[in-house]
Regions:
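Rossmann-fold dinucleotide-binding core
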Residues: 1-43
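NAD(P)-dependent dehydrogenase/reductase Rossmann-like domain
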Residues: 125-169
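Electropositive, surface-exposed helix/loop patches at the edges of structured domains
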Residues: 21-28, 99-113, 150-158
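Short intrinsically disordered, low-complexity coil segments enriched in acidic
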Residues: 1-5, 66, 161-164
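Helical "substrate-binding/catalytic lid" subdomain
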Residues: 34-140
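Acidic-enriched, low-complexity/disordered segments with a strong bias for Aspartate over Glutamate
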Residues: 15, 23, 63, 90, ...
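Generic structural hydrophobic/aromatic packing signal, biased to beta-strands
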Residues: 1, 83, 118, 147-151
Length: 169
């Protein structure tokens, strides 16, 4: 738990009692800011990996991509395998978080486009049947190919679909 501001002493007493408390000291808002910076990093990476995997599926290059990643970037492949099925479980609330992060980036003069795109990926994930589940009811042994099929089906079922979005195979 991150805390900041002048009145953190009471919360700091919880440190080590089932809770890890990190005092960022300084002005109020630093704790919220680190949460946003961290979330923009983690969820931004998850959504980039999701977009890459879906693109590979749509272009018929999934196997080739996964082979290349297994040889050159095994940690990236492991992240895709771990996170792609999980994104839909929280996507509904993460959509708004991506909007908030994008606005913060924009207010700081940094491009907001990446996290606007991350929000789009969250919306796509939220349209899959996987989004009807929770972390407790998730299907944990679902094959990645099946997960990707759900994402592609959500694209294909989206109203106003353009020719560019249709699978090439």
């Amino acid at each position: 738990l991150y805390v900041s501001g002048k009145a953190t002493a009471l919360v700091r007493q919880l440190d080590g009692r089932g809770l890890g408390v990190r005092d960022l000291s300084g002005e109020i808002g630093r704790a919220s800011a680190i949460k946003m910076v961290y979330a923009s990093s983690t969820k931004g990476a998850f959504t980039l990996f999701a977009a890459v995997a879906v693109m590979a599926e749509l272009t018929g290059l999934r196997d080739e991509l996964f082979q290349e990643l297994s040889e050159s970037q095994p940690n990236t492949l492991a992240s895709i395998e771990r996170m792609l099925p999980r994104i839909p479980l929280d996507a509904n609330r993460w959509i708004f978080e991506m909007d908030e992060i994008a606005s913060t980036y924009e207010s700081l003069g940094v491009t907001s486009h990446f996290h606007k795109g991350a929000g789009d990926i969250m919306q796509l994930a939220n349209r899959t049947p996987l989004a009807t589940r929770t972390r407790e009811t998730a299907i944990h042994d679902l094959a990645l190919t099946d997960v990707l099929r759900h994402y592609v089906d959500a694209i294909n079922q989206n109203e106003g679909q353009t020719e560019k979005q249709k699978p090439t195979r």
